[in-house]
Amino acid sequence: MVKVAVMLAQGFEEIEALTVVDVLRRANITCDMVGFEEQVTGSHAIQVRADRVFEGDLSDYDMIVLPGGMPGSAHLRDNQALIQELQNFEQEGKKLAAICAAPIALNQAGLLKNKQYTCYDGVQEQILDGHYVKETVVVDGHLTTSRGPSTALAFAYELVEQLGGDAEGLRTGMLYRDVFCKNQ
């Protein structure tokens, strides 16, 4: 069974984290909210109780998801144990995903070299490696990135698809195409 860790640091962006958790769980994909602390407060003062506390080892997961928000993304970037786990995932060919400002953690881990990525407008100025593309969701190998709060659903559906879930069924059931794809 596929397992996903959504990392929660103080000041995470609630829409980005909880949308991913909700959509993955609707797809029956095991998804844990892994906090740097048991109780984590988002950037808009919403408190979330983590499913587990990060103790430096995520090897039992198949994907790590990094939500954005500030100062949450900076906390992700500055946590050396997490940076090591991101590097381990890269070496093992496991999936990594980041949205909004969180690609700064991927950059800190040295994982954006020769990769295409996207992020929240302006954050690319902090990322010296990689090739910024202004798209809703960018997939480059086993690395997936997205832009911000309004792209969280598209990001989550892409992750479901990558993990073998029924993304199209979820889009239909959640009325995504009716609302966001009327003219397509």
What residues fall within each predicted segment?
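Extended, subdomain-level signal for the structured scaffold at the beginning of enzyme domains
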Residues: M1-E92, L96, A105-Q108, K113-N114, ...
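Short, acidic/turn-prone active-site loops that include or flank metal/cofactor-
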Residues: D121-E125
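Anionic-ligand binding patches
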Residues: Y117
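Short, thiol/selenol-centered motifs that function as redox-active sites or metal-ligating centers
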Residues: I99-C100
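Short aromatic-centered micro-motifs
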Residues: V137
